[in-house]
Amino acid sequence: MFSTRKLATALTAGLLLVVTACSSQGGAQNTPGASGGGAAGGKSFAIAMITHEAPGSTFWDRIRAGAEQAAKQHGIDLRYSNDPDSSKQATLVQNAIDSKVDGIAVTLANAPAVGPALAKAEPVGIPTVVFNSGIDSYQKYGATMYFGSDESLAGQSAGTRLAQAGGGKAICIVHEQGNASLETRCAGVKKSFANTENLQVNGQDLPSVQSTIGAKLAQDPSISDIVTLDAGIATAAVQAKTEANSQAKVVTFDLSPDVVKDIQGKQIEFSVDQQPYLQGYLAVDSLWLQLTNGNDMGGGQPVLTGPSFVDAANIDKIAGFAANNTR
């Protein structure tokens, strides 16, 4: 895996030279004509990006910002769609194939449900890449490249830091039912920090998330650490522990302006960053390179965009990028 991580690092460094501030697009369903010149030979390609984004999650704003930046640079018609229901996401994939797009980038949070639809692209000559989730299954369904974090490694790395800090018991908050990547993260945490218990919440109902975490803290005062897998859930966890008068420490995956402030304010110990902007950028950029020059990245292996840690030691350096919606 060293070579793929090295590649991702190099790409990140190069990308920072061309990044411009991108505005958040929130929950819009489509990104028509996100073009701006740069297409090879004057040809504009249509690329579909299909994710399992759920309403209200700001995480995907950075995915889209990266994708839109790559589309703008290469004159690509980027067609974004999403549905957290895996069967409906599979339908969106089939719709993209039927519309004869030039390439497809997709997340595989539920690979058995979405993968069979994706596999239909290769026989009709549509190249596909997977990003964010699906590291263990992307090749099975015909995708040539994967861009994202190794979720097991990320979880283990977080668990190791908890163990080194002397924690006693952790709860790992799973906010999307059936999302294999989240389960893998928690399993990774438990591998390095054995006394870890999963807690299922409904990530689309933040008041409920806060009350569920608060009730768990009140029920079990031995909890020393709260591991959240999403920046919005982290904010709810900070509020829950404050209201419960708990001394538990909060750690999280992913960044947001609120998480940045909470790391600076010592309310969150650290964030495990998978660099979603980079995931979106590379997913679109790689398809353009494949279509125009026959390139592939990673040498048949996943290209890792994480894990990397953001904590008190480096938060001031990264805060500006987070404010630009690029970290």
Predicted regions and their residues:
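Secretory targeting and sorting signals
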Residues: 1-26
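Hinge/cleft segment of the Venus flytrap/periplasmic-binding protein
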Residues: 12, 23, 43, 192-193, ...
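Bacterial lipoprotein signal-peptidase II cleavage site
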Residues: 19-39
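Hydrophobic alpha-helical
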Residues: 90, 106-122, 189, 203-261
